[in-house]
Amino acid sequence: MSLGCLFGALSYACYFMSLSNFYRMEYWPGTRPAQEPTNIQLADITERTAFHDYWWAGIVIPHAIQQCFMTFADLFILERLASRVVESLTQSVKIRVKRLSTAANVIFFLLNLASIGLMMGCGIYNIFAGHDYLRSSAAYRSGDNFTGAQFNVDANHFNDLANNVQGVSCWLRHEPCNLH
């Protein structure tokens, strides 16, 4: 239980760090917060690359770590709670069935393992989506007419995993994203 609380505290620490970086990102150089506080336009390749690094290091990676910590917290806390609940139930009816406790622990473990797999799958998807970003950067350096990336962010959906994946993916492809 104490390990679960520790992982939970680390999880929320990572969450607030990524959230603060998210709001700080709105005032990244090159934005126009007075007119469009959630619209980020980056026309220069150097600035766009710096923004890309900041987005991953300051927001996406801490958010992924937060999800992992939360998963481990769930794993330790729910396993302990499940075993105690099952134990109390079996004692109340004078039936000691340890298999029920083991089955509950296995179910909670598989559910948390599935959530980790989901996070890893989204990360792999975002990595493979980056080839358009690199190709566009090369086109910009070669002198092609390349407009800056647009990334519309809705803060209300920051913690929504689907919107995060969609937002990062279309930002890497330099397409406008409307997350509502």
Task: Give short role names for the model-derived ranges.
Residues 66, 105-180:
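Extracellular-loop-to-transmembrane junctions of the mid-late helices
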Residues 1-102:
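Membrane-proximal first intracellular loop
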